UniProtKB/Swiss-Prot annotation:
Compositionally biased region (Pro residues): 28-38
Known partners and oligomeric status: Component of the Mediator complex.
Name recorded for this polypeptide: Mediator of RNA polymerase II transcription subunit 29
Major subcellular site: nucleus
Keyword Transcription (UniProt): yes
The keyword Coiled coil belongs to this UniProt entry's keyword annotation: no
Role played: Component of the Mediator complex, a coactivator involved in the regulated transcription of nearly all RNA polymerase II-dependent genes. Mediator functions as a bridge to convey information from gene-specific regulatory proteins to the basal RNA polymerase II transcription machinery. Mediator is recruited to promoters by direct interactions with regulatory proteins and serves as a scaffold for the assembly of a functional preinitiation complex with RNA polymerase II and the general transcription factors.
Gene Ontology cellular-component annotations: mediator complex
Entry-linked PANTHER family: MEDIATOR OF RNA POLYMERASE II TRANSCRIPTION SUBUNIT 29 (PTHR28314:SF1)
Length: 205
């Protein structure tokens, strides 16, 4: 009997060889840790950043709307218009002097500055500054009156939340508006009562 045939019969099915790439490739690891709190913290941080940006924008808008800031911004155009007005007036006086002495140069002088236009711009800047200063004075007077007749701080932000735990803190803006409306209505009622009483007295006489 051939021994090679026994060896062939006893040998099993050929085994598959595993490539070294398959042996060395690591299996993907699943992420661990609670995923819930992280998005909540990110949302909270984003909300805080948005609130800070809104507050900065409101502060910048308030600074732009401030009357004193507008007056300061008009100082540059006022100086420039004043300089142009004086220069154009000097040029006009020089031209008139030459015309009176019959020495007018018929040659072209290029662009001749208009005195009336520069003077109008100068007066426009002065009017704007005067308007802003008067408005600032009226705001200060109203602030003094409100502090005298309604002693108490008012929140600077119109939609600022009111802290209920601090009753001595500043009153919210809507409450302040309602209080002002009540005061105005009371003053109007007193005025109407005095007028009706004066009319009744005059009719009785």
């Amino acid at each position: 009997m051939n021994p090679n045939m026994n060896m062939m019969q006893m040998s099993g099915p050929p085994m598959m060889q595993v490539s070294p790439m398959m042996q060395s490739s690591p299996q993907p690891m699943m992420p661990t840790g609670p995923p819930g709190p992280v998005p909540m913290q990110q949302q909270h941080q984003q909300q805080q950043q948005q609130q800070q940006q809104q507050q900065q924008q409101q502060q910048q808008q308030a600074e732009k709307l401030d009357n004193i800031s507008r007056v300061k911004s008009l100082l540059g155009p006022l100086r420039e218009s004043m300089f142009l007005t004086i220069r154009s007036s000097a040029f006009t006086l020089q031209q008139n002097n030459l015309a009176d002495n019959l020495k007018r140069d018929t040659g072209g002088h290029g662009h001749v500055p208009r005195f009336d236009k520069h003077l109008e711009d100068f007066y426009a800047c002065c009017d704007q500054m005067e308007l802003h200063l008067k408005t600032a004075i009226q705001c200060m007077q109203q602030l003094t009156s409100s502090q005298h007749y309604l002693p108490g701080a008012v929140t600077a932000m119109r939609m600022e939340n009111f802290m209920q735990d601090n009753p001595a803190g500043p009153i919210p803006y809507p409450t302040y508006l309602n209080t002002v409306r009540v005061h105005v209505q009371s003053a109007k009622d007193i005025h109407d009562t005095l007028i009706s009483a004066a009319q009744n007295i005059s009719q009785a006489d």
